[in-house]
Structure formats: C-alpha cells, structure tokens
Curated annotation (Swiss-Prot):
This is Ribonuclease P protein component 3. It comes from Halobacterium salinarum (strain ATCC 29341 / DSM 671 / R1). One of its GO terms (molecular function) is ribonuclease P activity. It is found in: Cytoplasm. HAMAP family: RNase_P_3. Its main location: cytoplasm.
Length: 232
C-alpha cells in the first residue's frame, strides 16, 4: 500500500521525511504528487528510507485549452499523473482524459461529480480519488461537508464499479496516518476495511504499470521489446 503525499516546497516536510514516516506507519512507499518538480532523488531517498518513492505530479486544470498540453508534458516524465479540476465541468474533462491516472479530490473546494463523470472515469481508466484530508484535518461544518461529499462519491463509485484510490493527502510528516486510521475514516462514509486498503493498493498498481510503460522494453499494452525488435 502507498500513500500519496505533498512534499516540500508544496508541503512542509521533505520527501525523505515523508517517506520515512510513511514506512514507519505501515506503507510500502509514497507517491509524490506535487504541483511541480522536487529536487529529491527518488532512488536515493528510497534506499535511505526503505520505502519506494514514486515520482508523481498533479496538474491544475482551470481551463480546457491549456490543460491538455500541460497533461501531455507531465505525462512524459511522471510515473503517476493526477489532475485537479476547478469545477464540476472540468472534473468531467479530466475523467475523459486517458493520459490522466487520477482525478484528484473531485469533491473538494466546491467540486462535485455525477453519474456522467463517474461513468466517463470508468470508461477511460481514470481513478477517482477519495481524499480524506478534509475529514482528517477539518472540524465542524467543513468536516461534515467533506463526509457528505465522500459518501456521495462512494455511492456512485460502487454503483458504476468505477476505479478509485484512497489518500490522506499528507502535506507534512505530522499528517501521515496509518492504513488502519484511514480505514476508520472510510467506515464513516460506508467503506469496508477491504475497500480502503484496495484504494491504497491502487497507487501501487498504477506505479508498477506506468513504470513498465516508461521502460525501454515497452512497446504497447501486452507487447515488450525483445531480442528481435529494433527501433525503426
């Protein structure tokens, strides 16, 4: 199971500190989901912390015109590409973008989803994120609203059997919560223990799949370059 984190400069803690804390909490690795690049070397941090560090990115989607090009450029170098939209209509745009792995925090900051968006995500293989940050780090009405949005998302995801990931979205090592603690949050929105853990493992599956696609041996799904294949 992996956690998806925001490291310095987007967050308060370094990649190394987040990786070490996540490993201690029971994770096998982290996906670094910053808006931009970090100076950390994933391989070096992984060797020092005994946690796999995946180079990810989050694309801010505020308009359709420029978003496709930004997603294309990030896809060339990042192992995991998430995109966060600024409106429900742009949530649909992201859900229909096959270069995107994860529609990040679709219910946050006034966001919303409906059956059309969830079905599009299923069709295009885009994972819908259950971002527990608003439950873990908010209180009062904000926490109630976050729970309400996540319950709605769960009902739609279950009904249409759409792919999903789960994250606490820690921006500091102090925000990292163990899988068991995230399971407890999941129970508040109607998830089972197995569903929350499956959502955490989905980051692992995405990283493994996309690393294969970025490797020199990959040609197309189901096809790898062998001894008789040569570059044209």
């Amino acid at each position: 199971m992996y956690e998806a984190v925001c490291a310095h400069p987007d967050g308060d803690s370094t990649v190394a500190r987040l990786a070490a804390t996540a490993a201690s909490a029971g994770y096998d690795g982290i996906v670094v989901r910053n808006w931009g690049a970090t100076s950390a070397d994933p391989d070096a941090v992984g060797a020092d912390t005994d946690a796999d560090v995946v180079r990810g990115t989050t694309v801010s989607v505020t308009d359709r015109a420029g978003a496709s090009e930004r997603i294309r450029r990030r896809r060339e170098n990042a192992v995991v590409v998430a995109a966060r939209a600024s409106s429900p209509s742009l949530n649909r745009f992201v859900a229909e973008s096959e270069r995107v792995d994860v529609l990040a925090a679709p219910m946050a900051d006034g966001g919303d989803v409906n059956h059309v968006i969830v079905k599009a995500a299923r069709t295009h293989g885009v994972r819908l994120e259950f971002d527990f940050a608003g439950v873990l780090r908010a209180s009062g009405g904000d926490r109630v609203q976050a729970l309400r949005g996540l319950r709605k998302l769960r009902e739609l995801v279950e009904h249409y059997d759409a792919p999903f990931v789960v994250s606490g979205r820690p921006a500091s090592h102090l925000h990292v919560r163990s899988p068991r603690e995230l399971v407890a949050v999941g129970a508040e929105i109607g998830f089972t223990d197995a569903q929350v853990r499956a959502g955490l493992r989905e980051w692992t599956h995405l990283a493994a799949r996309n690393r294969r696609r970025l490797s020199a041996e990959f040609i197309a799904p189901g096809v790898k370059r062998g001894r008789y294949e040569e570059d044209p």
